[in-house]
């Protein structure tokens, strides 16, 4: 399904399954392709977060074969996860999350979307069993490239992954799940951000997206100096958009808990997708930044909801 309008731009973007069989099988098991197609079909049009327009989408959920035809947002520029960003760019990116999170905050009807749910007990149990093994594999693969603070954080976190997988009773909404610079497009003509790659969207704690972006996108000095203001501004905008009963103290605690989300993603993705030179550099950088973030926030007491 898609937009039947004749007002097509000069170019469009076609998105297809990965050619690598390991990545493709991982996406099938995780329902990643289904999530992305359904997000564009069902949710993108009703949310104020900026995304490419859908022209056509279809998927065979049994095989994982899919196609998405999306508007080309050129000349927008893709962010660079390895290079990071300035505090001003981070503020734009965090502000854009309000348009994703606020409209369906604690909306029970989200549970009617099975492809968006991640509350399956069997799935959580599988992840709780799998992730410590992937962490061991990550350390073995990268050896001395895994910094001491990453080892310290990972050894503290992954044995408690089952606690982290538990969802809180409230403060849940639609989350992106991989909200980082590589998945954002920036328009030089104005202060606009567009969000792409919705293969990890889910129902989850909003602050995981915020902490994940801040922890990955800013260097340590900028993060430490600006993260309090970024969280304050996000919380104020969230309240301004109509979210009630979510105070600043709770927001900050959820942000601390969310700092672990990036380490989980860095390790899991590194071990479950096709290995590339840039991928190795990116995942090691992510692991380093996210581990330092969690340790800076003393987040070991915030693993459980």
Language model features by range: what are they?
Residues 1-4, 10-13, 158-206:
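Active-site acidic catalytic loop and adjacent metal/ATP-binding pocket
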Residues 2-128, 206-207, 222, 244, ...:
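Conserved ATP-binding subdomain of kinase catalytic cores across diverse folds
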Residues 38, 200, 206-243, 259-279:
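Active-site activation/catalytic loop segments of kinase-like enzymes and analogous catalytic loops
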Residues 43, 100-103, 160, 213-216, ...:
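Generic, well-ordered alpha-helical scaffold segments in large soluble proteins
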Residues 62, 89, 171, 175-176, ...:
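Secondary-structure capping and boundary motifs in well-ordered enzyme cores
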Residues 77-176, 188, 282-285, 294-305:
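ATP-dependent phospho-/nucleotidyl transfer catalytic cores
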Residues 243-259, 290:
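All-alpha amphipathic helical-bundle segments outside canonical DNA-binding/catalytic cores
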Residues 259-305:
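ATP/Mg2+ or Mg2+-diphosphate-binding catalytic cores
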């Amino acid at each position: 399904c898609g937009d039947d309008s004749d007002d097509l731009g000069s170019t469009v973007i076609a998105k297809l399954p990965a050619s690598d069989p390991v990545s493709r099988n991982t996406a099938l098991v995780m329902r990643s392709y289904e999530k992305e197609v359904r997000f564009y079909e069902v949710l993108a049009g009703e949310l104020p977060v900026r995304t490419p327009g859908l022209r056509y989408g279809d998927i065979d959920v049994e095989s994982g074969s899919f196609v998405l035809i999306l508007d080309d947002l050129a000349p927008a520029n893709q962010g660079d996860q390895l290079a990071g960003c300035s505090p001003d760019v981070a503020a734009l990116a965090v502000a854009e999350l309000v348009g994703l999170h606020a409209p369906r905050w604690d909306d029970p009807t989200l549970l009617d979307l099975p492809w968006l749910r991640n509350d399956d007990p069997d799935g959580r149990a599988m992840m709780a069993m799998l992730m410590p093994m992937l962490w061991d594999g990550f350390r073995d693969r990268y050896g001395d490239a895994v910094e001491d603070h990453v080892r310290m954080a990972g050894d503290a976190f992954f044995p408690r992954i089952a606690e982290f997988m538990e969802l809180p009773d409230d403060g849940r909404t639609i989350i992106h799940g991989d909200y980082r610079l590589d998945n954002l497009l920036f328009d030089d003509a104005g202060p606009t951000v567009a969000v792409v790659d919705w293969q990890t969207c889910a129902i989850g704690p909003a602050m995981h997206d915020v902490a994940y972006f801040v922890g990955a996108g800013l260097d340590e000095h900028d993060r430490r100096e600006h993260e309090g203001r970024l969280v304050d501004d996000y919380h104020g905008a969230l309240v301004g958009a109509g979210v009630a009963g979510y105070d600043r103290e709770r927001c900050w605690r959820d942000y601390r808990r969310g700092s672990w989300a990036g380490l989980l993603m860095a390790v899991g993705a590194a071990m479950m997708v096709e290995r590339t030179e840039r991928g190795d550099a990116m995942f090691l950088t992510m692991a380093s930044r996210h581990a330092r973030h969690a340790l800076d926030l003393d987040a070991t007491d915030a693993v459980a909801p």
